[in-house]
């Protein structure tokens, strides 16, 4: 590959240390796809003869068949996926195979491979996200009036519906989907034709290659095209935010499954037991997703640290970009697959959720709002309700269980109709506006969600 310049062979340890074929063979299909497009462009531009290109393309198809059949012999001595493919191509078609690399460097070749691979993986991840969100919409629709506590500081705050809470998850994931769709636009720019760093002296037409490979744009500067990996960092950043959201969801499910909450049940197939405690049903799937978020965060830091001090253009450091990206994609894909199957099958324990809501004076804000509508300043209403809650705590009862006389001792603005506003159902129904937890609003949110998901179909 470069023997003409050197006076001695590469040290065997160095050859193994610098080889990437152990992991970048994952790009084989995309590498061959890019080579076929490159060869076709060379023919269209009159740089290679049509017969030679036909021979090269036939040979590349044979190489791909061997790889897919598991019959390909990968060689560390050939360093990477590119040289392994090219060497086998030359074995098959002879010296004409050596013409394939005309007007191309491994620098723009690998940058193209990464983008082709990541574009495909991004599409797969978006499809999984849409599937997961569709399942959440189904779950939310079933529970628009299933009452549960809404929390702040993990303390009971106000009543919400389980469906409303699930729709909060949906909104998080929807923004994640938008981020990935937006990142895909920058992934889908073609670096091929940039050669090593300065372009090529051959009269190539990059628009031909871009069209053949489905790129929507062409990298405008050859130095930038071969040396930056910001598109991979952006993807990993979006993946990190997504995993953060899934980790938060996991934490809630883990808490809700505990005996202390007992809000939800997860089907047994998503749980494991204990080797010593026969009673245990452990939420391993959400626990692992919560843990795997740390891996994705770490890969983002790896890529940022990898790029932070590199001068233009390509450096061998960039060989280290692949394994973090592979791990990020694999971890995210596995987590989404698990969630897409598990989350829509969660069963809420309605009675326990309702009972928990009754314990926390969740309608206190409703009583304050009631007083405000009767002319009491909010800060005064806040104090009145605080006193009423203190009495409820002392008596061991909910606000709705206090008598009218007990409530009126704190404010003469309280009338007999107050109890209509202290029911959990009344509290939900009162929040009847866009984004509110009223059952009707949650139903509308689900309907809008289905329409919005169609944008990603």
From Swiss-Prot:
Per the UniProt record, which EC number(s) apply here? 4.3.2.1
Q: Which SUPFAM superfamilies match?
A: L-aspartase-like
* Annotated catalysed reactions: 2-(N(omega)-L-arginino)succinate = fumarate + L-arginine
Enumerate the subcellular locations listed in this protein's record, separating them with semicolons: Cytoplasm
Q: Check the record and name the PANTHER family matching this protein.
A: ARGININOSUCCINATE LYASE
> What family, per the record?
Belongs to the lyase 1 family. Argininosuccinate lyase subfamily.
- In Swiss-Prot or TrEMBL terms, this protein is called Argininosuccinate lyase
State the organism of origin: Psychrobacter cryohalolentis (strain ATCC BAA-1226 / DSM 17306 / VKM B-2378 / K5)
Species lineage, top-down? Bacteria, Pseudomonadati, Pseudomonadota, Gammaproteobacteria, Moraxellales
């Amino acid at each position: 590959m470069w023997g003409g310049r050197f006076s001695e062979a590469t040290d065997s340890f160095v050859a193994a240390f610098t080889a990437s074929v152990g992991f970048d063979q994952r790009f084989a299909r995309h590498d061959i796809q890019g080579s076929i497009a490159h060869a076709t462009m060379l023919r269209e531009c009159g740089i290679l003869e049509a017969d030679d290109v036909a021979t090269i393309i036939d040979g590349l198809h044979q190489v791909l068949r061997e790889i897919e059949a598991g019959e390909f012999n990968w060689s560390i001595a050939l360093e990477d996926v590119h040289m392994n493919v090219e060497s086998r191509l030359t074995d098959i078609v002879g010296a004409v195979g050596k013409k394939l690399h005309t007007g191309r460097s491994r620098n723009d070749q690998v940058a193209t491979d990464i983008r082709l691979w990541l574009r495909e993986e991004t599409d797969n991840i978006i499809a999984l996200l849409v599937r997961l969100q569709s399942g959440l919409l189904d779950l939310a629709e079933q529970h628009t009036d299933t009452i549960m506590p809404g929390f702040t500081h993990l303390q009971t705050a106000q009543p919400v519906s389980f469906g409303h809470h699930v729709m909060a998850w949906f909104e998080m994931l929807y923004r994640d989907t938008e981020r990935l769709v937006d990142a895909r636009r920058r992934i889908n720019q073609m670096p091929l034709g940039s050669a090593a760093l300065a372009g090529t002296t051959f009269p190539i037409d990059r628009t031909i290659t871009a069209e053949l490979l489905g790129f929507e744009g062409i990298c405008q500067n050859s130095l930038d095209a071969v040396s930056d990996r910001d598109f991979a960092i952006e993807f990993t950043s979006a993946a990190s935010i997504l995993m953060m959201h899934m980790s938060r969801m996991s934490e809630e499910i883990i808490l809700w499954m505990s005996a202390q909450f007992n809000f939800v049940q997860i089907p047994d197939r998503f749980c494991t037991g204990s080797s010593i405690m026969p009673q245990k049903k452990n939420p391993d799937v959400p626990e692992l997703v919560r843990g795997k978020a740390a891996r994705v965060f770490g890969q983002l830091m790896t890529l940022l640290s990898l790029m932070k001090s590199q001068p233009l253009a390509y450096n061998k450091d960039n060989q280290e970009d692949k394994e973090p990206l592979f791990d990020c994609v694999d971890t995210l894909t596995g987590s989404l697959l698990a969630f897409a199957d598990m989350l829509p099958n969660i069963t809420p324990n309605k009675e326990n959720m309702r009972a928990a809501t009754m314990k926390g004076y969740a309608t206190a804000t409703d009583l304050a709002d009631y007083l405000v509508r009767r002319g009491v300043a909010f800060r005064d209403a806040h104090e009145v309700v605080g006193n009423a809650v203190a009495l409820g705590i002392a008596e061991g009862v909910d606000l709705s269980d206090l008598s009218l006389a007990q409530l009126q001792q704190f404010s003469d603005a309280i009338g007999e109709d107050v109890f209509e506003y202290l029911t959990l159902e009344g509290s939900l129904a009162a929040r009847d506006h866009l984004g509110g937890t009223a059952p009707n609003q949650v139903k509308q949110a689900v309907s809008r969600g289905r329409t919005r998901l169609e944008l990603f179909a």
